[in-house]
């Protein structure tokens, strides 16, 4: 009877661990990505040739970041941050979004 009694706490611990892992997995699935909680652009380019750009996304200031961010997706799939104050970037935004 002693072996069954000692395996009960071990089984209970395993069940609790499994429950915690499942709960943590569900929480992680709905949690925002860390980079959404801060500015995404740490460095910016002053411009890039329009023919290399597939799309442009402009993010206005908000609780996650106090700056306007311009993120261009290149035709290669790479994302680059552009300086929203640069004259060339203003022209790119105007052509891509209007």
From Swiss-Prot:
It is found in: Secreted. GO terms for molecular function: chemokine activity; growth factor activity. It comes from the Eukaryota. PROSITE patterns: SMALL_CYTOKINES_CXC. One of its GO terms (cellular component) is extracellular space. Residues 1-29 form the signal peptide. InterPro entries: Chemokine_b/g/d, Chemokine_CXC, Chemokine_CXC_CS, Chemokine_IL8-like_dom, CXC_Chemokine_domain, Interleukin_8-like_sf. The keyword Secreted applies. Disulfide bonds join 39-65, 41-81. One of its GO terms (biological process) is immune response. SUPFAM superfamilies: Interleukin 8-like chemokines. Keywords: Cytokine, Disulfide bond, Growth factor, Inflammatory response, Secreted, Signal. Belongs to the intercrine alpha (chemokine CxC) family. This is Growth-regulated protein homolog gamma.
């Amino acid at each position: 009877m002693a072996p069954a009694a000692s395996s009960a706490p071990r089984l209970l611990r395993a069940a609790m661990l499994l429950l915690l892992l499942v709960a943590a997995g569900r929480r992680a699935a709905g949690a925002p990505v860390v980079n959404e909680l801060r500015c995404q652009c740490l460095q910016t380019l002053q411009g890039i040739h329009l023919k290399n750009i597939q799309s442009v996304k402009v993010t206005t200031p908000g609780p996650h970041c106090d700056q306007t961010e311009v993120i261009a997706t290149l035709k290669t799939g790479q994302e680059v941050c552009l300086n929203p104050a640069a004259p060339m970037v203003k022209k790119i935004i105007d052509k891509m979004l209007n």
